[in-house]
Amino acid sequence: DDITLKQVAVNSSNLMEGMCIKGVLGHFFFESHGIDLTKEDAILNNIELSDTHVQVMLADTTETPKDTTDTALNWKVTLHTLKLKNVSVDLQMPLDSMGLKAHIGNAEIADAAADLKHQFYGWRKFLLTGTSVNYDTGGPGSAIGFDPSHIALHDIRMGIDSVMYYGRDMNAVIREFSMYERSGLSVTSLTGRLFADSTVIRIPSLKLLTPHSEMNL
């Protein structure tokens, strides 16, 4: 019913053409009390991942053959709890000098569901804290002020609850969002709600605060 892995070293070497994965998996815990392969139904009770750091190198320039198979995916997955702590991913693409790094301090998802047959997705609660993202492309060094080729976000905090996506319908509650960028650009607070269907998108009670401005919709 559960799997635990601790201090696992990962090195894909040459097993995957055009891709190399290296890293350390500090602690991984997986608990499930209901996976039915026949009915394509899975209940994932608890997933925890911590102290994990992975580097991904992409160098594949070959064209992937088009998949012409037609296999229906009817899986229905229910996830009760997912927790991440001190997890980082370093994505490098040397052939086009692009790099993307992300570090997650803490992240938690509660009561998530995905129904692939009916294209229904959602979760009750999502919280992300202590997170940073760095994006770099082109040569080294960055311009003064905001540089879209060298973006460095830190102290990202995000809380999005009551998310539902079904067909063209979407609901979400932006409970909190804040972040800072190395250039000085920052979002002190962003809150609001989102409703959308095939004809309209509404964002009532949207409130954006920065250190020097405020916007309400």
Mark where each language-model region is.
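N-terminal targeting/secretion presequences
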Residues: 1-217
